[in-house]
Amino acid sequence: MQIFGKILGAFFGFLFGGVFGALFGLFIGHQFDKARRLSQAGFKTAGFGQGPSQAQRQEEFFKSAFAVMGHVAKAKGQVTKEEIQLASAMMDRMSLHGEQRRAAQDAFREGKERDFPLEQVLERVKIATSGRFDLLQFFLELQISAAFADGDVHPSERNVLHKIARGLGFSSEQLERRLQMQEAAFRFQRQGGFGGQQHQSHHSSSHGGWQQASQTDRLADAYKILGIDANADGKEVKRAYRKLMNEHHPDKLMAKGLPPEMMNMAKEKSQEIQSAYDLIKKEKGFK
């Protein structure tokens, strides 16, 4: 039990402010002890692949991801049905059952608490990932997906996402770019952009104008998914594609410490990038 902060806080508070000072010092000391306890709950060793600590770090990443998702969902003041459904859908995509699913649900609920220590949790994520860019990026993208659960990002959710991005070491510009990419990815997916023909392709020729407009929108979203302009040449397209695939390759992420439960989501992200690239490649006519 950690009471060092409480003792010091109460002592100096009483010394300078009497009884009321002691009470205030006790409160400050409690906050200090809480932050110290959370910090010590993290992982102090560096690097993945050190025997048992690998599993511990993966568990930290896993639970923190769902806890922060809960925090994002609560940003508007009330968690919507769509956000709960998204969290459940993510658990389904990760094939979480039994104890694992309960752990994810418990973490999500913890994130909704008013005094959720976001900064300390993000610091533990950075320690657990050894600050690896691609793992931190994957963590941030999970939170962006959660924010888009009900189709739009509320200003309060955007503010929380900026806090998360800063806590993980990303700039506001980097976050806004990823928000644009994720929004484009959702539209692209709804229009049948991932692996296969567009849903509306069987419609009659009388809808040709609508289909052409839809195809144009899909292409525009494909460029946004890769983070490039529509006038990018073949070399620029390939460079952006290879960079994103290198950052999101499931096997590489697993080797660096991504929890195995999140492997399917990493595969979906790489398929999203591949589908966008294939559409652009077909449009520009290069191999």
Curated annotation (Swiss-Prot):
Residues annotated as region Disordered?
Answer: 192-213
Topology check: give the Cytoplasmic ranges: 31-287
Annotated membrane topology is: Single-pass type III membrane protein
Q: HAMAP family attached here?
A: DjlA
User: Origin organism of this chain?
Assistant: Vibrio vulnificus (strain CMCP6)
TM region(s), chain numbering: 7-30
Gene Ontology CC terms: plasma membrane
**Domain J per the UniProt entry, residue ranges:** 221-287
Its subunit composition reads: Homodimer.
The Gene Ontology terms for molecular function here are: protein-folding chaperone binding
Kindly give the PROSITE patterns that the UniProt entry links to this protein: DNAJ_2
The free-text domain remark for this protein reads: The transmembrane domain is a dimerization domain.
- CDD domains reported in the protein's UniProt record: DnaJ, terB_like_DjlA
Protein name (record): Co-chaperone protein DjlA
**Keyword Cell membrane included in the entry's annotation:** yes
Which residue stretches are annotated as topological domain Periplasmic? 1-6
